[in-house]
Amino acid sequence: METGAKALRLLVLFIASSCVPFAAFAQTTPSGPAIDAEVNNIMTETHSNGMAVAVVDHGKVGYVHAYGIRDAKGDPLNTDTIMYGASLTKMVFAYTVMQLVDQGRLNLDTPLRDDLDNPLPSYGADPVFPDKYGPYKDLADDPRWEKITPRMCLTHSTGFSNFWFVEPDMKLHIHFEPGTRFSYSGEGLILLQFVIEHGRKAQGLGLDVGDLTRANFDRLGMTRTSLVWHDALETNVDDGWNDQGQPQAHEKRKKVRVAGSMNTTISDLPKFVAALVRGDGLSAASRAEITKRQLHITSAHQFPFLQPELPVSEQRKDLYAGLGVVVFDGPQGHGFYKGGHDGGTANTVVCIEAGQRCAVILSNDVRSEAGFADLVKFILGDTGVPYDWEYGDHAGKS
């Protein structure tokens, strides 16, 4: 009888333990010296000249450190060095958009045509920066633009290529029915920026996105972060290195482009990431929308864009677009991430909802990308972040 009771107790304990949520199996963040050693190893392996790393734990910024050099002269990279944020800008923009949703100025599912006073194709180029937005006149004969919503812009499902200027004819095209599938598109986010900046003032639009983001940066104490270059950023600026180890001058972007004009530092950016993972500055509903499974991603890789869909049996079941981020489910539960890349830049932010834990990595050497998967795993443990989809065999290549 006692033996049977003991077996029953063990069975109950086993069932209970198997139902414990992911958060209960908390990962331990490595010490600062351990992170330093791992970063130095990865920099050696990838031939990287510079990296900067920060850790967020329980929604608070923890360890922050910079490694290597910031320019070809050999000046040290430090935590206040201005670095190019690249496509991490998209994550910041999505957060800003959801604040406008909270304020009732935008609705995620209202077609953008309803936010404008005139048809989109009737708008000409910006008088100051002619290439700030897309050539919307190119859509005059394609009524599908009228279906595009803010949600589609933030989930990369507008049907646009990444940018109009990569099209063979240098024109803006819609390649598939808006909202039906994912294909990475900075152009879609630029369209949403246009509507926010030129939309109906009667509903609270006609706003400067640079001002909106700056208000958040000021609130969070991000004193050296901006979506547009200004004089205060002129000191302690990095250069980049391409995959051949050749230095690349830091581009000083004079116009706000939400697809990728942000400059930041490793001291600043984790403050935003911590606020995002906590939901600071957003309603609970808007915070949930950002990391919700919005749209299933069915391609083999993120790039090249406009890839065909994989057969259903080969699609990753947990891979979805969030709003401005990609979401996934792994050994530690639900997570989200965003990357940033250009010829001499490699960035990544990975967050796990359980424990509000994030790794923030900025690099001024594109070759660092090849070590991101190992470094994120070292800091956060096994997350399941889909770097195979993100990079394919292009990690570390310009």
Model regions: which residues?
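Short, surface-exposed loop or secondary-structure junction motifs
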Residues: 123-336, 341
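Short, gly/Ser/Thr-rich active-site loops of penicillin-recognizing serine hydrolases
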Residues: 295-304, 308-310, 363-398
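Short, well-ordered beta-strand elements
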Residues: 335-339, 346-365
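Short, conserved catalytic-motif segment at the N-terminal edge
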Residues: 28-84, 105-107, 128-129, 166-176, ...
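N-terminal secretory signal peptides that target proteins for export/translocation
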Residues: 1-7
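Short active-site loop at a secondary-structure junction
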Residues: 44-52, 73-126, 133-151, 176-188, ...
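Bacterial N-terminal signal peptides
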Residues: 10-23
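Extracytoplasmic/secreted proteins, especially bacterial periplasmic and envelope-associated proteins
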Residues: 30, 34-41, 92-96, 107, ...
